[in-house]
Amino acid sequence: MHNYLEHHVEGQGLLDLTDLGVQAKRMAETIIDKGFPELEEIYGSEVTLYYPGLYAGATDLCGVYMGRESIIDFKQTNKPKKAEWIEDYKLQMAAYALAHDQVYGTDMEQGVILMCTPDCFFQRFIINGQEFKDYKGKFLMKIDQYYQQKKESS
């Protein structure tokens, strides 16, 4: 699914006629049809982000989504999720946003998770406002805890 979405964003095609490839294409098309209409601008695809001296990762997209600068990530799942079940995804969005802010001097306002199941059930989770700021704070606390534990175990 991720490969199809990445190729779509880059204006390229991808053909995989295996059963898994056909399913991945259907899932990607669901995300494109239901999640991409609100994508107004793409800054980058498969963007490697890092917070100097602390961590690194790669997000699927950075851009403007529903009028806000956003970190956008695609997720495939076997069954639909409730918002309270995706805490780790929300923290991941916050981590990417903090890294983007630090390196590029931005103020990413929003995390967007576009999710699809194998039977093409689409879900969109948007984290912004105070909730997004809170997740940024929670992620920084986790980083502090990690480095404190690492220091104590040395």
Model-derived segments and spans:
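Metal-dependent nuclease catalytic cores that hydrolyze phosphodiester bonds in DNA/RNA
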Residues: M1-A56
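Acidic, carboxylate-rich catalytic segments that either coordinate divalent cations
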Residues: E152-S154
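Mg2+/Mn2+-dependent nuclease catalytic core
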Residues: Y43-K150
